[in-house]
Amino acid sequence: MKIFFIDNFDSFSYNLVYELECLGYEVAVYQNDIDPSYLMGLMNEEPKTPLLFISPGPGNPNSSGNLLKIIAMAKKKFPILGVCLGLQALAQSYGAKIIRSKEIVHGKATTIALKKHAVFKGLGESMVVGRYHSLMASGLPKNLEVIAEHDNIPMAIVNEEDKILAYQFHPESIMTLQGRALLEQSVGFLRELS
């Protein structure tokens, strides 16, 4: 499965690209100012359904170039995996609000509660993750299932019908001890849905 990676001009982007390449995936990186129609054309040319990966980034979904337009065009056509800003943008695309979190965290290890779900198979009932965010998704609609949370902050969301999966935390962070395994299971899960 080829991964089309949207870089939201974030310093963590290439850490994620590296992790995905270590797992054996071909990764093509595009910045969030790419023309959405051009990107969809490239993705449609792939012989096998590719995955769209939305990176972390500064700011909020509304200040992230063409990100929301890209999501609107890709949703329900391609599997999408988002991290941090990626979760916020996906949640907003379903009608959630993005609000300031009670706690601003930039490099904090946090234990989060995991619900039983295929992406967490073998990872336990909780997980230590690296968090870097001041915003959070709020008022999620029923078609976005929260599968991990901390202090009422959605840490992982999924919509299996639309092939959407996203994490508020950073799987590539050194603080996320099982991050590579989680990334591998996440891409595998979305590939099976495609």
From Swiss-Prot:
Report the enzyme's class at the first EC level: lyase
Catalysed reaction, written as an equation = chorismate + L-glutamine = anthranilate + pyruvate + L-glutamate + H(+)
Q: Which domain of life is it from?
A: Bacteria
Q: Does the keyword Lyase apply?
A: yes
Listed pathway(s): Amino-acid biosynthesis; L-tryptophan biosynthesis; L-tryptophan from chorismate: step 1/5
Pfam families recorded for this chain? GATase
Active site per UniProt: 84 (nucleophile), 170 (for gatase activity), 172 (for gatase activity)
Q: Which UniProt keywords apply?
A: Amino-acid biosynthesis, Aromatic amino acid biosynthesis, Glutamine amidotransferase, Lyase, Tryptophan biosynthesis
Q: Where does L-glutamine bind?
A: 57-59, 88, 134-135
Matching entries from InterPro entries are given as:
Anth_synth/Amidotransfase (IPR050472), Class_I_gatase-like (IPR029062), GATASE (IPR017926), TrpG/PapA_dom (IPR006221)
Q: Which GO terms describe its molecular function?
A: anthranilate synthase activity
Glutamine amidotransferase type-1 domain residues? 2-194
Q: What does this protein do?
A: Part of a heterotetrameric complex that catalyzes the two-step biosynthesis of anthranilate, an intermediate in the biosynthesis of L-tryptophan. In the first step, the glutamine-binding beta subunit (TrpG) of anthranilate synthase (AS) provides the glutamine amidotransferase activity which generates ammonia as a substrate that, along with chorismate, is used in the second step, catalyzed by the large alpha subunit of AS (TrpE) to produce anthranilate. In the absence of TrpG, TrpE can synthesize anthranilate directly from chorismate and high concentrations of ammonia.
Q: What is this protein called?
A: Anthranilate synthase component 2
Q: Which species expresses this protein natively?
A: Helicobacter pylori (strain J99 / ATCC 700824) (Campylobacter pylori J99)
